[in-house]
């Protein structure tokens, strides 16, 4: 007699106890890489508001620079679409956060919000507001990130609910 397992969709990745830890490790390593690289300009700058440039992650070279780890490159390849990166255009620590002043911030967009944030076509995947919540964009505009979490937190009770809260990791 064959035993059938329920469909894989019944076991979302976030249901694994190691999921939040894995994502936090990826975010910490990526933030460290950006910091060691001197908080470089974002790739494809989407906007500059109140002196803060917002765009996509710069390309991490596999052969040189701060991001030579194959594990980091693989993780960024897998999760980079959900990340955005912002920095103070003048190089100062113009962003305030619970961790202190920041020259930049690595942003990780949570699951898409119901009824919005399309991410199907290549064009859908470009706008930051298809990944980041309006509260995150407002925090960037005001240069105050203190109200945003700096870690991925998935409490056991909500593992089957959308994890839509964005994460902001300060780059001092």
Which sequence ranges carry the predicted segments?
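Short, surface-exposed interaction loops/tails
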Residues: 1-172
